[in-house]
Amino acid sequence: MSNVPAELKYSKEHEWLRKEAYGTYTVGITEHAQELLGDMVFVDLPEVGATVSAGDDCAVAESVKAASDIYAPVSGEIVAVNDALSDSPELVNSEPYAGGWIFKIKASDESELESLLDATAYEALLEDE
């Protein structure tokens, strides 16, 4: 069973979301997602300043097996990207919940968080897959 940190929120598409300060959230892909994808070779990051809607594909994780879209779990503005992934995409594999984060978003509608899963619900989703 994959590691599912209790303090995070999750999407059904296997993104995680961690609350930071001032309505900003860090986004990455879950340990389960990176296990399915395999070794990362490239991450196509979104543009800082881009405005996205919840569910928009805004990044791509490319692995030795496949390329997978990464979706915005909430609507808002991309305020930072993890530039370290340009040289070290494998951080998504080795540190999916830490150094392997993908982007930070300033949420425009925090009520959208209510549609995300908590750790218990995400674990149940994984059991059903």
Curated annotation (Swiss-Prot):
* Protein's name according to its UniProt entry: Glycine cleavage system H protein
Gene3D superfamilies (alphabetical): 2.40.50.100
The record's listing under CDD domains reads: GCS_H
BP-aspect Gene Ontology terms: glycine decarboxylation via glycine cleavage system
Query: Taxonomically, which superkingdom?
Result: Bacteria
InterPro entries named among the record's database cross-references = 2-oxoA_DH_lipoyl-BS (IPR003016), Biotin_lipoyl (IPR000089), GCV_H (IPR002930), GCV_H/Fam206 (IPR033753), GCV_H_sub (IPR017453), Single_hybrid_motif (IPR011053)
* Family, as annotated: Belongs to the GcvH family.
Cofactor binding: number and manner: Binds 1 lipoyl cofactor covalently.
The gene designation is: gcvH
Its job = The glycine cleavage system catalyzes the degradation of glycine. The H protein shuttles the methylamine group of glycine from the P protein to the T protein.
What's an example GO cellular component term for this entry? glycine cleavage complex
Q: Which residues form the Lipoyl-binding domain?
A: 24-106
Look up the record and name the cofactor or cofactors this protein needs.
Answer: (R)-lipoate
N6-lipoyllysine PTM positions read: K65
The record's keywords, sorted A to Z, are: Lipoyl
List the Pfam families.
Answer: GCV_H
Record text on subunit structure and interactions: The glycine cleavage system is composed of four proteins: P, T, L and H.
